[in-house]
Amino acid sequence: MHKRLKIYSVITSIGVLIVLLQGALVTKTGSGEGCGATWPLCFGEVIPTNPAIETIIEYSHRIVSGLVGAMIIILAIWAWKQLKHMREAKALSFAAVILIIFQGLLGAGAVVFGQSKAILALHFGISAMSLAAVVLLTILAFEDGREHTMAPKVSRGFKYYVFFVITYCYAVIYSGAYVKHSEATLACAGFPLCNGQIFPGLYGPVGAHYFHRVVGTILLLFLLILMIWTLSRYRHYRVLTWTAVLSFLLVVGQFISGISIVFTQNALSVGLIHALIISILFSALSYMTMIITRPSH
């Protein structure tokens, strides 16, 4: 059912992922001021003359973000109408629109008015949530028409643990974005020690970097527990099991890419992979959260 909606939702999901990676590229290359303090124009021009590479990166991000934002709104309206009989469709459609608007306002505000590092870090976190909302709408489009949707019966304790893990994952995403915006990516040399110290303190750029290392490592342990719990108690739910295993594999990849950033001196490709993996991980956990909150069959 809804073949065109399925195709469109997949394309939109890919578009959101591209916007997310473009945003990470803007931050990694310091291109946030590539268009000066003007928005939506670039240095007051529709097409900037003799643009520097930073200008091209920033302005292309704005253009693609605008196009994908329009695509998300269309998807939300389409899903609201075609999937309204599905439990999560309206809430996800509403969330997708609100998140993309909020994301755009944060980006525009950062350019025109400037923002603190704490506020700027929200931008990437909202992007991850926006991706998750669109991905879940895409999944709903593919689920529609099936005799039974995935609705595993799990314990209350398991549900609460998943809620805790996804909330904690978002906090880790925020801490990583804060590290980037505070230019603390290379504040800790070496691994596992930080500048030759077991505990360098929690102040300044070094503290921000070290804190992110610690909370990231703890996330890996939390997802290991989630995988073991799922395999031991809910192995008969194949989708739930594979989501838990995938989440753990993703966080392992995230851990490795994070270490690689230090040893490659913040190589651009490694940094983008780091941003990509955590965004996919958050979407996977969002899917798990969605299916375990459904009334069981």
Swiss-Prot record:
Active site: E58
EC number: 1.17.99.9
Intracellular or extracellular location(s): Cell membrane
Pathway in which this enzyme or protein is active: Porphyrin-containing compound metabolism; heme A biosynthesis; heme A from heme O: step 1/1
GO cellular component: plasma membrane
GO MF, one example: metal ion binding
Cystine residue pairs: C35-C42, C188-C194
First and last residue of the signal peptide: none
Topological domain spans for side Cytoplasmic: 1-6, 84-93, 140-156, 232-242, 293-297
Entry binding sites for heme o: H61, H123
Xref: InterPro entries: COX15/CtaA_fam, COX15/CtaA_HemeA_synthase, HemeA_Synthase_type1
Gene Ontology biological process: heme A biosynthetic process
Membrane topology: Multi-pass membrane protein
Extracellular side, ranges: 28-62, 115-118, 178-210, 264-271
Binding site for heme b: H212, H274
Domain of life: Bacteria
Catalytic activity: Fe(II)-heme o + 2 A + H2O = Fe(II)-heme a + 2 AH2
Keywords of this entry: Cell membrane, Disulfide bond, Heme biosynthesis, Iron, Membrane, Metal-binding, Oxidoreductase, Transmembrane, Transmembrane helix
Transmembrane segments: 7-27, 63-83, 94-114, 119-139, 157-177, 211-231, 243-263, 272-292
Free-text domain note: The N-half (TM1-TM4) and C-half (TM5-TM8) domains are connected by an intracellular loop. Each domain is formed from four-helix bundles and they align in a pseudo twofold symmetry manner. The N-half domain is the substrate-heme O binding domain and the C-half domain is the cofactor heme B binding domain. The cysteines of disulfide bond Cys-35 and Cys-42 may be involved in transfer of reducing equivalents from quinol in the membrane to the active site of the enzyme.
Assembly: Interacts with CtaB.
Family: Belongs to the COX15/CtaA family. Type 1 subfamily.
Function: Catalyzes the conversion of heme O to heme A by two successive hydroxylations of the methyl group at C8. The first hydroxylation forms heme I, the second hydroxylation results in an unstable dihydroxymethyl group, which spontaneously dehydrates, resulting in the formyl group of heme A.
UniProt-recorded name of the protein: Heme A synthase
Organism: Alkalihalophilus pseudofirmus (strain ATCC BAA-2126 / JCM 17055 / OF4) (Bacillus pseudofirmus)
Gene behind this protein: ctaA
